[in-house]
């Protein structure tokens, strides 16, 4: 078996169709690349709401309603959070709730709908939620220039969460908001980054037809000093360090998790199925994103390293289009090119590039957050369940997950996370097979089981999310079954509910949500009496009625 040398190299390569696959045996890709850890910088005064960091330097409310107040005061002692940071052991699964995408204003200087946020946090606390998840947008917090950080609006939110006894999962969102499922607002990358992408369009992921994607910087340029003297990975590391220093007083007590964005929608994947401008529609197979000159240069070097230079000119020329199905494409059909020596070579390279990207950013994150007690690092992996029942798993392959009938694509990811002690956050936990279009061979349940097994075998904590907004008991039942109704060692370490908004605070939805949270977090989940849970949830809904109504109205405006 020949090994691939996947070292990054610069230089352009012609984007022409590759030669027909040859009969040769190709090995799995070479080992991962680790970025060196960097010594942390001293924390600045928390009184300063806006930070300016030299990029050239070394990388380093209103009172509660009486009924709600009585409800909180009546809770047993052990149910109150320890804001000081000492978490008590819980048997169930803690539930977090995603904040609206536009929680912080685009200028970064405050919160949108502040009164709604305040009422919402109090309501979530009353329902037993552990905390919230919020996107810390690169395009907001470092918008004005390299090293000029503005966390003012996020500081306001952290203080509000702490006051209400809620924990925070902070997402380092290095991607654009807009263009993916559920994106209701648009928050582009920092304007100084977009200026560099305009000068060098190969910094954007590119498909076979030359279409550029500006959601996230191409991983092919990870190690290139293309952002005013810094590499993208250095920019990500500097941003995370600035966040850590600015929120030092909240780390480990209020901020308990840093989810590190690694691609579109914050997920470790390629932007193979962009919804913007109708490019992709479910359940299309998507397209490979390897046609910027940095990616093509790496592909060329990898092909030469295995003695097959003709394989290094471009990706598969017969892999179809965004909205095709596997059988439409010679590459993805039952015995197609994916299952040939050429296909194995290409998929090994393509998926290994994604793994190395994750390794580099995780190394940077570990260098920043290692030694910060009480703070976990997590990485989000996409739940691409359509065409999972086919042999080629085409939609997973174009996204960078080399998962087929013959090859496990999630074990390598889990092992990478294990090296850094990171949590694997996975989506589509709420889905059942029979709810999906059967002709697309969707298998969300089997996919979740496969990822859970990979996490378990690698010793990695598994956390979950619902991929789409769901407020019905059927979805809640599926989440409870998948995440909580298991032996303790197989339970998810956390679940994040998508998403806070006016629909969540509709009376029936809110009552069902309160019952769901109780089922997830109660000790001995399988022994919980459903009728008792419903009664208690009704009590929460009644006690928080005015608060929830206020939140629903404010969030609708």
From Swiss-Prot:
It catalyses: Hydrolysis of (1->4)-alpha-D-glucosidic linkages in polysaccharides so as to remove successive maltose units from the non-reducing ends of the chains. Optimum temperature is 35 degrees Celsius. InterPro entries: Glyco_hydro_14 (IPR001554), Glyco_hydro_14_CS (IPR018238), Glyco_hydro_14B_pln (IPR001371), Glycoside_hydrolase_SF (IPR017853). Keywords: Carbohydrate metabolism, Chloroplast, Glycosidase, Hydrolase, Plastid, Polysaccharide degradation, Transit peptide. Coiled coil: none annotated. GO terms for cellular component: chloroplast. Optimum pH is 5.5-6.0. Its EC number is 3.2.1.2. Its main location: plastid. One of its GO terms (molecular function) is beta-amylase activity. It is an enzyme of class 3 (hydrolase). Residues 1-38 form a transit peptide. The active site is at 267 (proton donor), 465 (proton acceptor). It holds the Pfam family Glyco_hydro_14. It is found in: Plastid, Chloroplast. GO terms for biological process: polysaccharide catabolic process. Substrate binds at residues 135, 175, 183, 380, 385, 427, 466-467, 499. Belongs to the glycosyl hydrolase 14 family. PANTHER family: BETA-AMYLASE 1, CHLOROPLASTIC, BETA-AMYLASE 2, CHLOROPLASTIC. This is Beta-amylase 2, chloroplastic. It comes from Oryza sativa subsp. japonica (Rice). The gene is BAMY2.
């Amino acid at each position: 078996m020949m090994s691939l040398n996947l070292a990054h190299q610069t230089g352009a390569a012609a984007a022409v169709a590759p030669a027909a696959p040859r009969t040769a045996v190709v090995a799995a890709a070479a080992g991962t690349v680790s970025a060196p850890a960097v010594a942390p910088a001293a924390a600045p005064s928390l009184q300063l709401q806006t930070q300016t960091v030299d990029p050239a330097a070394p990388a380093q409310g209103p009172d509660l309603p009486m009924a709600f107040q009585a409800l909180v005061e009546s809770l047993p002692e052990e149910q109150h959070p320890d804001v000081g940071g000492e978490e008590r052991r819980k048997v169930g699964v803690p539930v977090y709730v995603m904040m609206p995408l536009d929680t912080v204003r685009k200028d970064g200087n405050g919160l949108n709908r502040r009164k709604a946020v305040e009422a919402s946090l109090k309501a979530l606390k009353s329902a037993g939620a552990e905390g919230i998840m919020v996107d810390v947008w690169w395009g907001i917090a470092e918008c004005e220039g390299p090293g000029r950080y503005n966390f003012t609006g996020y500081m306001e939110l952290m203080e509000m969460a702490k006051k209400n006894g809620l924990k925070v999962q902070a997402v380092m969102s290095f991607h654009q908001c807009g263009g993916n499922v559920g994106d209701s607002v648009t928050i582009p990358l920092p304007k100084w980054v977009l200026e560099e992408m305009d000068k060098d369009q190969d910094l954007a992921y590119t498909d076979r037809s030359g279409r550029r994607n500006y959601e996230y910087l191409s991983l092919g340029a990870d190690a290139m000093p293309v952002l005013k003297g810094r590499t993208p990975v250095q920019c990500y590391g500097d941003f995370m360090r600035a966040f850590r220093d600015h929120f030092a007083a909240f780390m480990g007590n209020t901020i308990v998790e840093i989810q590190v964005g690694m691609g579109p929608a914050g997920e470790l994947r390629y932007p193979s199925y962009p919804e913007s401008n109708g490019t992709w529609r479910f359940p299309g197979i998507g397209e490979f994103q390897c046609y910027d000159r940095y990616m093509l240069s790496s592909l060329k070097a990898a092909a030469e390293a295995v003695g097959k230079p003709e394989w290094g000119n471009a990706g598969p020329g017969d892999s179809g289009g965004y909205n095709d199905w596997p059988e439409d494409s010679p590459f993805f059909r039952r015995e197609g090119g994916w299952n040939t020596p050429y296909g194995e070579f290409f998929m090994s390279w393509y998926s290994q590039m994604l793994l190395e990207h994750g390794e580099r950013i995780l190394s940077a994150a570990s260098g920043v957050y290692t030694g910060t007690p009480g703070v976990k690092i997590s990485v989000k992996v996409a739940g691409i369940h359509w065409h999972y029942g086919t042999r080629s798993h085409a939609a997973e392959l174009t996204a960078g997950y080399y998962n087929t009938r013959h090859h496990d694509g999630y074990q390598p990811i889990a092992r990478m996370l294990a090296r850094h002690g990171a949590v694997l956050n996975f989506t589509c936990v709420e889905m059942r097979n029979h709810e999906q279009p059967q002709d697309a061979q969707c298998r969300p349940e089997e996919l979740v089981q496969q990822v859970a097994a990979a996490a378990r075998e690698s010793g990695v904590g598994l956390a979950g999310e619902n991929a789409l907004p769901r407020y019905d008991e059927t979805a809640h039942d599926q989440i409870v079954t998948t995440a909580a109704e298991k032996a303790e060692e197989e339970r998810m370490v956390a679940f994040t509910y998508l998403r806070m908004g006016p629909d969540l605070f509709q009376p029936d939805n809110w009552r069902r949500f309160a019952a769901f949270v109780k089922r997830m977090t109660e000790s001995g989940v399988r022994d919980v009496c459903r009728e008792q849970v419903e009664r208690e949830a009704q009590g929460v809904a009644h006690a928080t009625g005015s608060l929830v109504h206020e939140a629903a109205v404010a969030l609708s405006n």
